[in-house]
Amino acid sequence: MNKKAAIIAGVAIVGLIGAFALSGKNKSQETEVKGTEVVTVQDENGTIEVAKNPERVVTFDYGVLDILDNLEVDVIGLPKKSVPQYLSKYKADTYSNVGSLKEPDFEAVNELNPDLIIKSGRQADMYDKFAEIATTVYLSVDGSDYLNDFSRNLDVLGKIFDKEDFVKENLDNLT
């Protein structure tokens, strides 16, 4: 075999090995998605698919934390520096600190291996960094239409955590 043919054969073999490696990875990712029920929700960035009932949740919004607390949904991480008094149980060591509302600690978030990250307007320009770590939902509340935005957030979280009936039954108490 001449030198040119050997180089072409070597490149082809490397390409085939890479293709096989990538095809195996895609199949395992597809299997994981197929085994998980997914819900489609509307956030500030549009329509997003989220695994239903994620277990490892990080939030960067205390309003969302309050909703999750009322829905009896556990979180694993939050910014702990300025947690409101009525949510002070989340200052416990049981919950990981993931930076501040304005300056997330992306390393700390990544180490938690979350299934879902919920962020708000203060982290609006950081969406891509969060999305590299886990599925990220962007929920916010506009002061000019607070009640409608809050109700929408309740609906989104109710759908994600399979608590839609609870939200409907308790909407007056939650708003």
Where is each model-derived feature located?
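Short, flexible loop segments at the rims of nucleotide/cofactor-binding pockets, characterized by
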Residues: 35-37, 53-54, 93-98, 114-116
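A short, structured surface patch at a secondary-structure boundary
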Residues: 56, 61-108
